[in-house]
C-alpha cells in the first residue's frame, strides 16, 4: 500500500532523500557517533570538575535531549515525525542523595516525558510543585525506589507541528492543519493527524514501526 500522505511528503524532502542514500549514511552515522563520543568526553570533564571542587555529592546531574534523529532510518532525515528514533530520547539522572542508593546504577523502562523534569527539579530545589500548573510528574519516586516503573504511567503523549516545514507546501495545508498527536503505551502507538487518516502501530509485533 502507499505510504501515509504526511510520511510520503517528508520522504520527498531533499534531506530525507539524501539521508536515505547508503553512501551518505556511511559517512554521517560514524560522524554522529564521533560527536556523541566528544559529548561524552566533555561531560566527563564537567563531572571531574565537580569532584575537584567537592560538589559532586550535593549536585543533581541530568543528561537529556530534546529529540532524536532519523539519520536515514525510515527513509527520513532530521527529527520531524513520530517514530521512536525521533521522539525517544535519553534521560540519565545522577542523584547523589542517600535516598537514591537503592536504584543507583540501574535503568528504568517507565514511560516518562520531558515535562516531568520541571516538577522533578522543582522538588529537588525544595520548592512547592504546583500541580495545577505543571502537567508533568516528579520522577523522585522512580529515582528513589518508591514506585515500580510499571505502575508509573500508562501512556505518554507527543505532539508534532510541521507548519514551517516543506511538507506543508506539498500537502497544500493551512498551517493550523500541520499537526499530529501521538499517544504511546508499551504496546501501541496511535498517531492522529489533522486532515489525514490515523496510524496505529503494535510495537510488540512491529517494534520498528513499519
Q: Which functions belong to the PLM regions below?
A:
Residues 95-97, 162, 205:
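Non-catalytic surface loops within mature trypsin-like serine protease
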Residues 67-73, 115-118, 123-199, 203:
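C-terminal cap/loop subdomain of S1 sulfatases and analogous C-terminal strand-loop tails that border
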Amino acid at each position: 500500500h502507499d505510504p501515509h500522505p504526511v510520511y510520503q511528503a517528508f520522504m520527498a524532502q531533499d534531506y530525507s532523500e539524501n539521508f536515505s542514500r547508503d553512501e551518505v549514511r556511511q559517512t554521517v552515522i560514524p560522524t554522529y557517533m564521533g560527536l556523541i563520543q566528544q559529548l561524552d568526553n566533555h561531560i566527563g570533564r564537567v563531572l571531574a570538575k565537580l569532584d575537584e571542587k567537592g560538589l559532586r555529592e550535593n549536585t543533581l546531574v541530568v543528561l537529556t535531549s530534546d529529540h532524536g534523529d532519523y539519520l536515514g532510518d525510515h527513509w527520513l532525515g532530521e527529527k520531524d515525525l513520530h517514530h521512536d528514533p525521533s521522539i525517544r530520547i535519553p534521560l540519565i539522572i545522577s542523584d547523589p542523595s542517600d535516598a537514591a542508593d537503592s536504584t543507583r546504577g540501574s535503568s528504568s523502562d517507565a514511560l516518562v516525558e520531558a515535562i516531568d523534569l520541571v516538577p522533578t527539579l522543582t522538588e529537588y530545589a525544595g520548592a512547592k510543585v504546583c500541580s495545577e500548573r505543571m502537567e508533568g510528574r516528579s520522577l523522585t519516586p522512580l529515582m528513589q525506589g518508591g514506585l515500580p516503573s510499571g505502575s508509573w504511567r500508562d501512556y505518554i503523549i507527543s505532539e508534532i507541528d510541521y507548519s514551517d516545514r516543506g511538507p506543508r507546501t506539498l500537502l497544500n495545508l493551512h498551517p493550523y492543519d500541520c499537526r499530529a498527536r501521538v499517544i504511546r503505551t508499551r504496546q501501541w502507538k496511535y498517531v492522529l493527524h489533522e486532515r489525514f487518516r490515523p496510524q496505529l502501530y503494535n510495537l510488540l509485533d512491529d517494534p520498528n514501526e513499519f
